[in-house]
Amino acid sequence: MSTSITLFGAGSWGTALAVHLAAAGRDVTLWARRDEAVERMRTTHRNPTYLSDIEIPPSVHVTSDLEAAAGASSLWAVAVPSQNLRSVATRIAPLTRPGTTVVSLAKGIENETLQTMSQVLADELGGMEAQQIGVLYGPSHAEEVAENQPTTLVAAAPTEPRAEWVQDAFMTERLRVYVNTDVVGVEIGGSAKNVLAIAAGIGDGVGYGDNAKAALVTRGLAEIRRLGIAMGAKPRTFAGLAGIGDLLVTCMSPHSRNRYLGEQIGNGMTLEEIESEMDMVAEGVRTTQSVQDLARHHDIEMPVTEAVHRVLFENRRPEDMVDELMTRSAKREHWLPQGLRNVS
């Protein structure tokens, strides 16, 4: 397929997709904010900051010219940290054209507005129809995508034809893409799992075993599902790639920034110390605040998220997190608030 794709953001994920898609024959433009990074990538075919051991194919058009990047394609994929998405969307909004499709690769919930990434894009790209905006999520560490390892993603958009178009654009022999029209479910699953990854990492750092991690993952998925249903998501989405798939890889993998951050907290480091030494953003820290606020807004009980919030922002001991979760009142395993019990 000869689709042209513009990737806004030359972090790990933007770089990995540029490398992978270009190797598969796509016409790829990669926009980076800093001129010096662009110059390094053009001359050395390496990203100086992210995935620096991976060669960027010469066919990738690297630029810091926003207008040139926007004009190179009618399919834009925005791969910037979630809390920076709005500022980038504001800049590209005047450059949209009829037929442009914009896909968010960022996973998160905006702190100030509690909007998902597609909602942020819809806010800023006001002239676009809702069906032109989607997301591409799933269990996908950038390192493995850049190395051409088998990976699966889900393209979510309000209409199936638009989601299928994104699917076709990104599908390669080693990148298999599925379609879903439950955009909010895909976004909540793909964003809230970062909170659970921090919880899993805290358990690793404290020294808890596989039983505890399995409990955190499964009970964490249950509370993500409750929140998603309250926001209009379809329950089955959380059994898919953006639900259990993304949750498993993020909670288990040594590549996971959020799991690593949690592990260091479990080892006794402070959040400030960890963030100062990390080169990359751990989205789960900011998402923890947003998800807790969403849970309170929708009156949804999310005990694992609340426990992570107390450790991150209220100076609670990591050891107390599991103790508090284990001594909660008895519950049914499959439980929903009364107003959601008819949802299947």
UniProtKB/Swiss-Prot annotation:
Residues the entry annotates as binding NADPH: 12-13, 33-34, 107, 142, 257, 281, 283
According to its UniProt record, in which pathway does this protein act? Membrane lipid metabolism; glycerophospholipid metabolism
- Disulphide-bridged cysteine pairs: none
- Give compartment(s): Cytoplasm
* Keyword vocabulary terms for this entry: Cytoplasm, Lipid biosynthesis, Lipid metabolism, NAD, NADP, Nucleotide-binding, Oxidoreductase, Phospholipid biosynthesis, Phospholipid metabolism
State the EC number(s): 1.1.1.94
Q: Which Pfam families match?
A: NAD_Gly3P_dh_C, NAD_Gly3P_dh_N
In the record, what terms sit under GO molecular function? Answer: glycerol-3-phosphate dehydrogenase [NAD(P)+] activity; NAD binding
**Active site as annotated:** 193 (proton acceptor)
Instruction: List the GO cellular component terms.
Output: cytosol
- Extract the InterPro entries matched here: 6-PGluconate_DH-like_C_sf (IPR008927), 6PGD_dom2 (IPR013328), G3P_DH_NAD-dep (IPR006168), G3P_DH_NAD-dep_C (IPR006109), G3P_DH_NAD-dep_N (IPR011128), NAD(P)-bd_dom_sf (IPR036291)
Q: Which GO terms describe its biological process?
A: carbohydrate metabolic process; glycerol-3-phosphate biosynthetic process; glycerol-3-phosphate catabolic process; glycerophospholipid metabolic process; phospholipid biosynthetic process
What is catalysed by this protein?
sn-glycerol 3-phosphate + NAD(+) = dihydroxyacetone phosphate + NADH + H(+); sn-glycerol 3-phosphate + NADP(+) = dihydroxyacetone phosphate + NADPH + H(+)
Residues engaged in binding sn-glycerol 3-phosphate: 107, 138, 140, 193, 246, 256-258
What family does the database annotate? Answer: Belongs to the NAD-dependent glycerol-3-phosphate dehydrogenase family.
Q: What does this protein do?
A: Catalyzes the reduction of the glycolytic intermediate dihydroxyacetone phosphate (DHAP) to sn-glycerol 3-phosphate (G3P), the key precursor for phospholipid synthesis.
Q: Can you name this protein?
A: Glycerol-3-phosphate dehydrogenase [NAD(P)+] 2
Q: Which organism is it from?
A: Salinibacter ruber (strain DSM 13855 / M31)
Gene name of the record: gpsA2
